[in-house]
Amino acid sequence: LVERNKKMHIKKYPELKSEIDKAYKMVLDKKVLPSMRSMQFGGKPIEISPNRIYNCAYVPVDHIDSFSETMFLLLGGTGVGYSVQKHHVSKLPVIQKPYPKRKRRFLIGDSIEGWADSVKVLMKSYMNGGGSRIEFDYSDVRPKGARLVTSGGKAPGPQPLKECIVKITGILSEKEDGEQLTTLEVHDIVCHIADAVLAGGIRRAALISLFSADDQEMIGCKSGNWWETNPQRGRSNNSACLMRHKITKDFFLDLWKRVELSGSGEPGIYLNNDKDWGTNPCCEIALRPYQFCNLCEVNVSNIESQEDLNERVKAAAFIGTLQAGYTHFHYLRDIWQETTEKEALIGVSMTGIGSGRVLGYDMEEA
């Protein structure tokens, strides 16, 4: 895995071969770690879809393409933070149902792009107006258990996608022409999308949903017996987005009481300075809309000197810089590449802090 990962970077940055070799000697010595997505999908999968090198991303659901992009990212192994805040969802087109007597067949491609396109086609059929009712053809989707050649593993078969399409259609068909999707409906659609993402028969999608602090439907999203009536909501952590400069003590305590009464420990509380910024599912970092996080890690459990620490951090930052250059996203809107290049994040974390070995060293120097 390490050699495959290294060769991928050398192929992209041949002029940096000696520096890459040096940095990856530290990877082999277990002193630093690249992004786990880059280890998992190093080589052809990332060369085909560079988004797969990134652990997580953030997208506001303010555009019809946000739904298909979420499917695309989740299927590629990237966790997704998304916003259903009122000012984002209000930008979505209103519902304009397809003509029931006019039908159009859509053959779903046997690929990540094909699955994402099925969501895109479905959403457009209910939001672009005057279109045909889509009849999805799953015949090209490989059967359950078939080998996935590029990324490895086994195919889930068409059933998870069928269920996803049926459930999303159920939400859309209940609306009247001219109505807008509610924040909770948008949230549920994204959760149904996540339900379709499986690997080896196990759910493999990470989500966090940020919503407006006064959104009562979203606050109660996981109240009552939601796991029976709306089990898809278990795919996402749900967090109220509170503006630090606006929040009052009384409002916070009222919301905290709702958390206690929910019995689920949710909603979470996400403190923010800008309502348009979001985060990744683990809340490790603030992200602009349409931005990816980029992580490397330093093993500090066996640091031997300040110089050793400095060299490890330097190597991790270098690998992170290499990873940040994978931005030619072929399926996503152009704004993803623009944002990720403009705000090229280089995250370097530490593991092994509990050993205490690193506590005596100068972090600022490192």
Question: Can you name each region flagged by the protein language model?
Answer:
Residues 1-366:
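Extended catalytic cores of very large enzyme megasubunits
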